[in-house]
Amino acid sequence: MSNPSPQVPEEEASTSVCRPKSSMASTSRRQRRERRFRRYLSAGRLVRAQALLQRHPGLDVDAGQPPPLHRACARHDAPALCLLLRLGADPAHQDRHGDTALHAAARQGPDAYTDFFLPLLSRCPSAMGIKNKDGETPGQILGWGPPWDSAEEEEEDDASKEREWRQKLQGELEDEWQEVMGRFEGDASHETQEPESFSAWSDRLAREHAQKCQQQQREAEGSRRPPRAEGSSQSWRQQEEEQRLFRERARAKEEELRESRARRAQEALGDREPKPTRAGPREEHPRGAGRGSLWRFGDVPWPCPGGGDPEAMAAALVARGPPLEEQGALRRYLRVQQVRWHPDRFLQRFRSQIETWELGRVMGAVTALSQALNRHAEALK
């Protein structure tokens, strides 16, 4: 009597064959829907694209080569860009060349800065540090140049001390500016002392810089020759003149801001009671001023009053520095100015203090000024 041969159940065999087919069919349907989503975006049918994604929430809005965000930037399609950001598109997503959406927006030139570059930067600031396969960041494509933290070290012996002091000073400035501009004034539960005024801050900064320069000069007097001592005294006089001009400009800017705030406060009250044209010393930072205390283009402390031509502002900064004969001191001075007017640092530090509708104009001027300073620094190498 022979044993019957084992047989595979018919249902199990059919199930094992159908599973890969159903998985492949599901993947194919999803890819077709994603292609349809991209076609709707390209044709400007944004309502249909949004409805498709609502019916099928599992679709990948970043799928495709180039990705939809890159296509919207290349076509200057601002509505499609806004829709993609609302639907959760990732500005840090890279295409086959390693470019992010910020790379694509930066390549469209100055016209795309406000409508494309700034929304992407606000959504994902960390994407500014992503490099493509050519080793470029979005800031380098815009011509901002690398931040000073990644620049090559100078060969002078005091370069490391200067860098450490600058980083420490920058951290203190950021903390003090947050207090001065009133970020925490709205918290009524913490009654603190009055914040330091802008003029007091600028005077203290000038004093600290002067003390540091005096200390360096005293340390170097023993090793320098008499001709070098004469050159150092001229450089010191130049620095004193620069500090005096900086303090005067800071006081003038503070007076101008004070008058502007007083005018806006008077307009808000409907001229119910007369007020002097200038606020008293206790009205430098009125509490509850709201958006009336935000900067406009003319309120930014430009090197030249009211801004103007970037080349002229850069030339004015260079003219206030050490003479051309002192190459080392002039390079150090230009490095400080490059850090102060670098677009990344400026945007990180002062974005919340500038009117939204003025942000594009201000950042355009800061970018042009930074590029002009970079050219002056390159000319000294």
UniProtKB/Swiss-Prot annotation:
The keyword Phosphoprotein applies. Residues 150-159 have a biased composition (Acidic residues). Signal peptide: none annotated. One of its GO terms (molecular function) is transcription regulator inhibitor activity. The keyword RNA-binding does not apply. One of its GO terms (biological process) is negative regulation of NF-kappaB transcription factor activity. Involved in the regulation of innate immune response. Acts as negative regulator of Toll-like receptor and interferon-regulatory factor (IRF) signaling pathways. Contributes to the negative regulation of transcriptional activation of NF-kappa-B target genes in response to endogenous proinflammatory stimuli. It is found in: Nucleus. This is NF-kappa-B inhibitor-like protein 1. Gene3D superfamilies: Ankyrin repeat-containing domain. Interacts with CACTIN (via N-terminal domain); the interaction occurs in a proinflammatory-independent manner. The gene is NFKBIL1. The modification Phosphoserine is found at residue 150. Residues 1-34, 129-167, 186-294 are annotated as: Disordered. Its main location: nucleus. Detected in different cell types including monocytes, T-cells, B-cells and hepatocytes. Keywords: ANK repeat, Nucleus, Phosphoprotein, Repeat. Coiled coil: none annotated. Residues 218-228, 238-287 have a biased composition (Basic and acidic residues). ANK repeats lie at residues 64-93, 97-130. InterPro entries: Ankyrin_rpt-contain_sf, NFKBIL1. The lineage of its organism: Eukaryota, Metazoa, Chordata, Craniata, Vertebrata. One of its GO terms (cellular component) is nucleoplasm.
